[in-house]
């Protein structure tokens, strides 16, 4: 459990301070998982993702390359490529505040270390894909609630990306159960996901 001496709604400091503290605590819990535990949990999460109707019917899927102790996306990506789906991965140019979307056919050969060392598509090898083609988006994040509220890494990239979509694809987050918290401080610009999938449960946002 996160430790706060009083409810989030009564937190006496700016919201960004609270978000920063939650990130710190949740990332520490995630990082404390052993490699074996992360692999096992990731396998269970992947199995849940692959049977979702939204995934099975999608032809164009946006995912992300795993960084640090995140959910391991490798098996999910391998499955979508094996089934002939278009794989889209995000790219961030240094100094930019937006994600650009690129089709990746072979992650082993077409990725490079980007900003903060996160693997991303090589712009010279991977064509740009318009967001309008996306049917399923796997959304990363640090913390989530059972109401599908999301806390990202602090850059606002996915909040801006999701908020700017003209039409909404399925927005699905994959996370370990240690990343699910009772509540999160929410700003006007924060974007929910449609579903949060963990190794032991699934949570859906209902309007």
Question: What residue ranges belong to the model's regions?
Answer:
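Surface-exposed, charge/polar-rich loops and edge strands
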Residues: 2, 28-31, 107, 122-123, ...
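Arg/Gly-rich low-complexity intrinsically disordered repeat tracts
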Residues: 5-15
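Proline-centered helix-kink/hinge sites
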Residues: 7-9, 90, 140, 185
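N-terminal active-site beta-alpha-beta segment that forms phosphate/nucleotide-binding
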Residues: 15-133
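Internal, well-ordered alpha-helical segments in soluble enzyme and binding-protein domains
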Residues: 22, 45, 157-158, 192
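Redox-cofactor binding/interface segments in oxidoreductases and associated redox assembly factors
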Residues: 63-65, 139-140, 198
């Amino acid at each position: 459990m996160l430790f706060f001496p009083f409810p989030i709604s009564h937190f006496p400091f700016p919201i960004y301070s609270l978000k920063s503290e939650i990130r710190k605590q949740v990332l520490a819990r995630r990082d404390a998982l052993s490699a074996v535990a992360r692999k096992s949990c990731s396998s269970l999460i992947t199995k849940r993702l692959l049977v979702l109707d939204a995934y099975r019917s999608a032809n164009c899927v946006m995912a992300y390359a795993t960084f640090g102790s995140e959910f391991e996306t490798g098996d999910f990506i391998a499955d979508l490529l094996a089934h002939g789906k278009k794989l889209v991965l995000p790219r961030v140019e240094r100094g930019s505040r937006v994600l650009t979307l690129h089709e990746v056919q072979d992650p082993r050969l077409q990725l490079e270390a980007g900003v903060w060392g996160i693997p991303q598509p090589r712009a010279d090898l991977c064509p740009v894909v318009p967001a309008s083609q996306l049917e399923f988006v796997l959304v990363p994040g640090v913390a989530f609630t059972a109401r599908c509220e999301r806390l990202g890494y602090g850059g606002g990239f996915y909040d801006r990306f999701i908020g700017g979509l003209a039409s909404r694809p399925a927005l699905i987050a994959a996370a370990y159960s240690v990343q699910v918290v009772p509540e999160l401080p929410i700003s006007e610009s924060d974007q929910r996901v449609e579903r949060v999938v963990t190794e032991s449960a699934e949570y859906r946002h209902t309007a």
